[in-house]
Regions:
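Bacterial signal peptide processing site
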Residues: 13-16
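C-terminal motif of bacterial Sec signal peptides marking the signal peptidase cleavage site
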Residues: 9-11
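Sec-dependent signal peptide recognition
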Residues: 1-6
Length: 125
């Protein structure tokens, strides 16, 4: 019985394993996520000129998001775009690309206070 209790305690204290790649991670504005020795923070939306849900557009537009990526002593602010370059960035063997940004704009609605960003993460090597 003591052995099982000790085993259960050890299992509960282990850090979760990194997910297999490729994977998607979803962050709310201000959230951070650790993956493969890096910490990715979704700082916010810098620009959102995507075509609103209730409009017809000749161009899909662009969403620009600001990320902070930290690994060890290194830290960088990075801007990724949905419609123009750079659409992805490679950092320490990982490539980050915007998979989705919600909510999408709506004509006549105020800009949302927070967004949900889904990043696609894959190995570059």
């Amino acid at each position: 019985m003591r052995f099982l209790l000790a085993l259960a305690l050890v299992a509960c204290t282990r850090a979760p394993a990194d997910p297999p790649l490729p994977t998607d991670i979803t962050l709310k504005t201000g959230d951070q996520h650790a993956i493969r020795g890096l910490t990715v923070t979704f700082v916010g939306v810098k620009e959102d000129s995507r075509c609103p849900d209730n409009a017809r557009c000749v161009w899909a537009g662009n969403a620009a998001v600001e990320l902070r990526i930290e690994g060890g002593a290194d830290s960088a602010a990075i801007t990724l775009n949905s419609g123009v370059e750079p659409k992805s960035i490679g950092v320490q063997g990982l490539r980050f690309t915007i998979a989705s940004l919600l909510p999408t704009p709506v004509i006549g609605a105020p800009a949302p206070a927070s967004h949900d960003l889904t990043l696609h993460v894959e190995a570059t090597r």
